[in-house]
Amino acid sequence: MTYLRTVFMFMITATSLTGWADDKVSHVVQTPYSEQKVVYDFYFDNPEKMASALFWIRSLMNPLMDDPYNMAPEFLDIVVVIHGTEIVTVARKNYERYKDAVERMRYYASLGVKFRVCGIAAHDYGYEPDAFYEFIEVAPSAITELAHWQLQGYALITPTVMEKRFSIDEIR
């Protein structure tokens, strides 16, 4: 009798676990996104973080430009405000050191992304407006610029760029 009870309990448990696993899985959603208005606040403690921060722009644009949304870039209104150490990445004299990031920014600018540098930060770093690339606009202040765009209904995104200490395979 004990043997039959054990087999019976095992079968019930196995059946219920199998059914539970089939019913409890994630699924893909298609959020009905509309045209985007976003202002990014770039303020980093290391200019090398600019390259990683640019992936935040890609992560907004690519899903919206791909299926099922197929939005044209002109329906994505994106402004990037630069006012930390990363300001050196958009100074023309530093092209060789930051050329990969510069070319990615130039590409995004060709899609309509606006890049604004804080005039106060530019002054603090000793840069005149002509020190920057043709796709850069110099605003009076990053803080007033961020407030302005938020008051116009833009969503504020402040990228957090961490140092990668583990590969995905190490922690998966």
Regions found by a protein language model. Give the residues of each.
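Hydrophobic h-region of N-terminal signal peptides that target proteins for export
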Residues: 11-19
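A cross-taxonomic marker for long C-terminal extensions/tails that follow the last structured domain
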Residues: 91-172
